[in-house]
């Protein structure tokens, strides 16, 4: 007799699509050197002291600090936010999940502004919430009036990526304040803060509904160690700390973050290099008649293909050892996203694109 395990699975997850992550470099079938431009990582890598600390680390047999006390102290110095308002997690993804677990009852609504970071929708639906999409305009700007019209008594959260991923679009502090003035708990995702220098931290005392997320994956070269943090009103930080699994920031990540914060000026210099390279990449991409690059304030550039198929271009680049992200969702049909790497990475990408356009 066949045992039917499926009947025990949550019915709302039967058709859950899951998340399509970037392909791991070791899975790419090519003999060429990989240029990885698909996940918005810092290709300069971690600070030298981080690499040294990881090479010398010998405490893997010990559980990490469950409260991340030293990391939070260093982050308090960095952000100017009190230690008790800071919560660390396994990437900002975990904090998104925890926020939704904390706020959402089945059927509660979350306002989302697509195209945007896919994990807002992913975790909302995983936690039995209802996504209410308020699409951006043709330039990928947020429609604040439409957000206001979408609010109902069931609205529990609004997610705003500042700047937006995957479009790179900026949003002004005044626009964010207009959203906060609507009175709904609002999560401002500042994953790319170090590339813009714009933050809502100074507004936290004025807006008790403001929550800020950040990550070490983009600017600090630590994507593989999965560390993010959030800045929250004290009551929310307390609740999140209660429901968060205690050892979510592993001991190697803990050590790496400590070194990163001590060497942050070094890492911020690499950020400056990436910002400069972003402008060069945008200028050069604009010269291809078949590509339309969108302005970006992050560490990537989104391009729409004016002719040809994005998926085919992605595959052709992969065959040359260059990994990029392809999008074909509503409002992002036939688009590619290029992370900004080192100058030699840009050179390799431009050379490959030039050969394809010949």
Curated annotation (Swiss-Prot):
Leading EC class: transferase
Quote the catalytic activity from the record: L-histidinol phosphate + 2-oxoglutarate = 3-(imidazol-4-yl)-2-oxopropyl phosphate + L-glutamate
Classification via Pfam families: Aminotran_1_2
Does the UniProt entry include the keyword Amino-acid biosynthesis?
yes
Alphabetized UniProt keyword annotations: Amino-acid biosynthesis, Aminotransferase, Histidine biosynthesis, Pyridoxal phosphate, Transferase
Q: Which GO terms describe its biological process?
A: L-histidine biosynthetic process
InterPro entries linked to this entry: Aminotransferase_I/II_large, HisP_aminotrans, PyrdxlP-dep_Trfase, PyrdxlP-dep_Trfase_major, PyrdxlP-dep_Trfase_small
Recorded GO molecular functions are: histidinol-phosphate transaminase activity; pyridoxal phosphate binding
Where N6-(pyridoxal phosphate)lysine occurs, the residues are: 218
Q: What cofactor does its activity depend on?
A: pyridoxal 5'-phosphate
EC number(s) given by UniProt: 2.6.1.9
User: What pathway does the annotation place this protein in?
Assistant: Amino-acid biosynthesis; L-histidine biosynthesis; L-histidine from 5-phospho-alpha-D-ribose 1-diphosphate: step 7/9
Q: How does it assemble?
A: Homodimer.
HAMAP family recorded for this chain? HisC_aminotrans_2
Q: Which family does it belong to?
A: Belongs to the class-II pyridoxal-phosphate-dependent aminotransferase family. Histidinol-phosphate aminotransferase subfamily.
The name this protein goes by in its record: Histidinol-phosphate aminotransferase
The protein's organism comes out as: Dehalococcoides mccartyi (strain CBDB1)
Q: Which gene encodes it?
A: hisC
């Amino acid at each position: 007799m066949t045992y039917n395990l499926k009947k025990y699975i949550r019915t709302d997850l039967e058709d859950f699509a899951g998340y399509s992550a970037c392909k791991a470099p070791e899975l790419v079938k090519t003999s060429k050197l990989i240029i990885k431009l698909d996940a918005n990582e810092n290709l300069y890598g971690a600070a030298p002291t981080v690499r040294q600390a990881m090479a010398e680390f010998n405490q893997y047999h010990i559980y990490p600090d469950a409260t991340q006390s030293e990391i939070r102290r260093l982050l308090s110095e960095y952000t100017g936010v009190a230690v008790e308002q800071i919560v660390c997690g396994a990437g900002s993804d975990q904090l998104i999940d925890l926020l939704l677990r904390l706020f959402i009852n089945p059927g509660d609504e979350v306002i989302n502004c697509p195209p945007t970071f896919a994990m807002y929708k992913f975790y909302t639906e995983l936690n039995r919430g209802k996504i209410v999409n308020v699409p951006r305009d043709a330039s990928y700007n947020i429609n604040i009036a439409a957000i206001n019209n979408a609010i109902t008594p069931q609205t529990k959260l609004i997610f705003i990526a500042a700047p937006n991923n995957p479009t790179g679009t900026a949003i002004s502090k005044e626009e964010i304040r207009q959203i906060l003035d609507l009175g709904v708990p609002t999560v401002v995702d500042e994953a790319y803060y170090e590339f813009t220098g714009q933050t809502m931290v100074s507004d936290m005392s004025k807006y008790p509904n403001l929550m800020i997320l950040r990550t070490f994956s983009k600017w600090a070269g630590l994507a593989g160690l999965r560390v993010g943090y959030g800045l929250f009103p004290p009551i929310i930080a307390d609740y999140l700390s209660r429901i968060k699994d205690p050892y979510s920031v592993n001991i190697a990540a803990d050590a790496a973050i400590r070194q990163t914060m001590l060497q942050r000026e070094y890492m911020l210099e690499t950020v400056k290099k990436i910002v400069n390279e972003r402008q060069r990449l945008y200028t050069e991409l604009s010269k291809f008649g078949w590509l339309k690059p969108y302005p970006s304030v992050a560490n990537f550039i989104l391009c729409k293909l004016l002719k040809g198929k994005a998926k085919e271009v992605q595959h052709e680049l992969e065959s040359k050892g260059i990994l990029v992200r392809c999008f074909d969702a509503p409002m992002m049909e036939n688009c590619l996203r290029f992370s900004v790497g080192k100058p030699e990475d840009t050179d390799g990408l431009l050379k490959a694109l030039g050969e394809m356009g010949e």
